[in-house]
């Protein structure tokens, strides 16, 4: 099987019966209406797909796949599923009818989505006559002014006679040549699903637009938002089986491991490296989004209303929570949208908002944060959050976007979450290296200015501690927490201070750098005191608690001596290393000389100690390979 050739994907738009399907049939030689009912009624009901090659130059062509959308207002949800994922549009207006109701609403929708107008075709030119056609061409150009389609050339065509079709093909080829490239094909894999069905012998088939990334036969995939895993059994693009396909492409995917009833329009196919099983990490599913919203001139947008969100091929009802009051007609604002159904929404996705009661498009916008913090309460907090969202909306580059995303969460955000938002760990870490305001620590990305008071609190607590003693780590964590530091971040901040030599670590406890000479001197006094107590009668050591209390030595400093091998713990007793070595030598020169065996009582008498000390000593010598024991007698092992 081959690798699918690159293609451009274009959606149609325009009023019902203005000749969209007929124009595509003339351009491609293919029938876009799939259903018998559509052909019988001459009315597009659902999405149709056709394709063709357009000549750019004598030896260069561009493959174009067309998504034919319905123009009837009763099927607007289907229309939105088509244009919701396609960046480029062929806008159609009939010369005889001229600009009509759905022409206007389709233009509003396309402008809200920021779609690029490739070409506008004024159809039925011969039926309307040259004068009427010229009027409509001029009118379409005027109506496009100030919208995302304003640079679209407007051409007169007639699908029946073929008038203007060659010019339209040339304009399409010229406008589409090289429009998409490596940036889209190298991005995170994402396929918006618009159909799911079953084929006998093959199983589940889904179709949709691969908007970015790659898919290959054998790939493991996840269907979002429910997170069901599947495997790519086969791929088809433009009617041919292929081994792999890259965005942007229309593609049919044969999925193994899923029934077709488990997949529906509005689901998204993701690769596992871009989909987290955590509900807090965007890409797989989200139930709330912060958005920038533009209200159309005829409609205010507020809390009250039956709002329907359309994004990608998906739709759901939403609760509307404007941040700073209702958004007036023709103005912009920010809002929190709470989704009735989780959707696989990402940063930067564009959407359309419709009033279900009035069956009217009222606005649209862009997703600024698909994993927002808890909705801010109080006017001051809402204003602060709105300013941060302004910063996000205005961000023109990746570093500014990252800073704004961190600010949107109060100056601290999960590294995993940011990586998912931005397309991967490598993308995030490369950008963070150039952002002076932020640092990554303990799985979080944090504003440096926020960290400063936390580190100051840690250092201050270390300074205030007695110079002769090290501070427990928990005490420094508590000091940082009192200044608002999350407890999960404080240990990493302490480790950073140790690495910067502002703190020194001894046995897991901390000492301020200025206290270190005093501490080391006091520690040596304590160590010497303990060793003296143990060596006063080396093989008859004192009670450990009594000895450590007398030396005023904390347990972690005792552990340091144990770790260094200066002191040895034999069950509940402490011996110096030299005492252990001396005990072994006495056995070797005494009852165990020349390979003789001996009893525990003989060892005890040789050492002139008690059974309390002798038995732990003998067990230590056995476990360290100095002696052996057969159940009754001990024997010194030759070194």
Predicted regions and their residues:
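C-terminal non-catalytic scaffold/interaction domains in large multidomain proteins
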Residues: 229, 371-639
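Beta-strand/loop-dominated core regions that host nucleotide or nucleotide-derived cofactor-binding catalytic loops
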Residues: 220-394, 491
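Conserved catalytic-core segments of large NTP-driven translation/proteostasis enzymes
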Residues: 2, 125, 142-297
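Conserved Switch II/interswitch segment of TRAFAC-class P-loop GTPases
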Residues: 62, 69-74, 83-135
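Conserved G1/Walker A P-loop phosphate-binding module
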Residues: 1-69
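P-loop/Walker A NTP-binding module and the surrounding RecA-like catalytic core of P-loop NTPases
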Residues: 10-14, 18-26, 74-79, 98-101, ...
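Conserved nucleotide-binding/hydrolysis micro-motifs of P-loop NTPases
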Residues: 72-73, 96-100, 115, 124-129, ...
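G-domain G4 guanine-recognition motif of GTPases
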Residues: 94-96, 118-135, 155-163, 168, ...
């Amino acid at each position: 099987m081959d690798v699918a050739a690159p293609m451009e994907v274009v959606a149609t738009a325009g009023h019902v019966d203005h000749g969209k399907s007929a124009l595509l049939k003339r351009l491609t030689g293919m029938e876009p209406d799939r259903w018998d009912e559509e052909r019988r009624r001459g009315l597009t009901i659902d999405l149709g797909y056709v394709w063709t090659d357009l000549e750019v130059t004598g030896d260069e062509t561009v493959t174009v796949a067309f998504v034919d959308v319905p123009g009837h207002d009763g099927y607007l949800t289907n229309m939105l599923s088509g244009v919701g994922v396609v960046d480029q549009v062929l806008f159609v207006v009939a010369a005889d009818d001229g600009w009509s109701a759905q022409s206007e609403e389709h233009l509003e929708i396309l402008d809200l989505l920021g779609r690029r107008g490739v070409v506008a075709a004024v159809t039925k030119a011969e039926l309307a006559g040259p004068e009427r056609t010229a009027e409509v061409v001029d009118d379409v150009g005027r109506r496009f002014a100030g919208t995302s389609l304003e640079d679209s050339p407007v051409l007169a065509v007639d699908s029946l006679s073929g008038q203007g079709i060659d010019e339209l093909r040339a304009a399409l080829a010229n406008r589409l040549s090289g429009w998409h490239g490596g940036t889209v094909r190298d991005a995170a894999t994402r396929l918006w699903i618009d159909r799911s069905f079953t084929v006998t012998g093959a199983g589940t088939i889904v179709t949709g637009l691969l908007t970015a990334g790659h898919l290959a036969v054998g790939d493991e995939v996840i269907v979002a938002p429910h997170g069901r895993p599947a495997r790519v059994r086969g791929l088809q693009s433009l009617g041919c089986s292929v081994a792999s396909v890259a965005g942007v492409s229309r593609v049919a995917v044969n999925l193994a491991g899923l029934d077709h009833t488990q997949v529906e329009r509005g689901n998204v196919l993701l690769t596992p490296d871009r989909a987290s099983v955590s509900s807090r990490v965007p890409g797989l599913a989200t139930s709330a989004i912060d958005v920038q919203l533009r209200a159309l001139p005829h409609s205010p947008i507020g809390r009250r209303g039956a709002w329907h969100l359309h994004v990608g091929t998906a739709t759901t009802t939403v609760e509307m929570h404007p941040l700073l009051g209702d958004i007036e007609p023709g103005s912009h604002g920010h809002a929190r949208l709470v989704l009735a159904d989780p959707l696989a929404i990402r940063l930067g996705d564009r959407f359309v908002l419709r009033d279900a009661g009035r069956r009217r498009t009222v606005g649209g916008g862009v997703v600024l944060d698909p994993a927002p913090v808890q909705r801010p309460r109080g006017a001051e907090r809402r204003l602060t959050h709105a300013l941060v969202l302004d910063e996000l909306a205005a961000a023109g580059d990746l570093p500014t976007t990252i800073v704004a995303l961190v600010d949107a969460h109060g100056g601290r955000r999960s590294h995993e979450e940011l990586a998912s938002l931005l397309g991967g760990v490598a993308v995030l870490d490369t950008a963070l290296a150039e952002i002076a305001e932020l640092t990554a620590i303990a799985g979080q990305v944090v504003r440096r200015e926020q960290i400063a008071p936390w580190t100051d609190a840690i250092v201050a607590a270390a300074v205030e501690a007695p110079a002769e003693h090290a501070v427990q780590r928990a005490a420094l964590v508590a000091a940082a927490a009192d200044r608002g530091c999350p407890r999960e971040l404080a240990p990493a901040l302490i480790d950073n201070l140790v690495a910067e030599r502002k703190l020194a670590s001894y046995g897991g406890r901390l000492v301020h750098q200025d206290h270190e000479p005093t501490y080391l001197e006091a520690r040596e006094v304590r160590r010497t005191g303990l060793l003296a107590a143990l060596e006063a009668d080396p093989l008859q050591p004192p009670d450990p608690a009594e000895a450590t209390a007398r030396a005023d030595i904390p347990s972690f400093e005792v552990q340091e001596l144990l770790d260094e091998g200066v002191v040895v713990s034999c069950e509940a007793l402490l011996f110096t290393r030299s005492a252990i070595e001396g005990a072994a030598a006495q056995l070797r020169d005494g009852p165990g000389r020349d390979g003789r065996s001996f009893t525990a009582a003989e060892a005890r008498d040789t050492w002139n100690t008690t059974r309390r000390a002798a038995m732990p000593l003998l067990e230590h010598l056995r476990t360290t390979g100095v002696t052996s024991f057969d159940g009754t007698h001990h024997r010194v092992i030759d070194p």
